[in-house]
From Swiss-Prot:
Part of the 50S ribosomal subunit. Contacts protein L20. Keywords: Ribonucleoprotein, Ribosomal protein, RNA-binding, rRNA-binding. GO terms for cellular component: cytoplasm; ribonucleoprotein complex; ribosome. The keyword Repeat does not apply. One of its GO terms (molecular function) is rRNA binding. Belongs to the bacterial ribosomal protein bL21 family. Signal peptide: none annotated. It comes from Maridesulfovibrio salexigens (strain ATCC 14822 / DSM 2638 / NCIMB 8403 / VKM B-1763). InterPro entries: bL21-like, bL21-like_sf, Ribosomal_bL21, Ribosomal_bL21_CS. The lineage of its organism: Bacteria, Pseudomonadati, Thermodesulfobacteriota, Desulfovibrionia, Desulfovibrionales. This is Large ribosomal subunit protein bL21.
Amino acid sequence: MYAIIETGGKQFRVEEGLELNVQKMDAEAGTKVDLDKILLIGQGEDVKIGAPYVEGAKVSCTVVEHGRDKKIVVFKKRRRKDSQTKQGHRQDYTRIKVEAIQA
């Protein structure tokens, strides 16, 4: 069984036992989180598509850890102007593990 969920403004295809990084969530490490914005649930040939979300469906997850991604360097240069800007950014994320998908 798989599901397509929406969290942090992005969509992810998840299955039971999968670990993935999502936008930072306000939850302690080791706590359970229920995600209810389920766009699609599929099992073999049987597929339920939400409009926009599947009613009564949820994905139970456990928060594994919080962390920060690799640094992204933003470099802007203006030719012939002797002007340049260098800026770095590290995005916060939450690593979750999918425990169960309930349709």
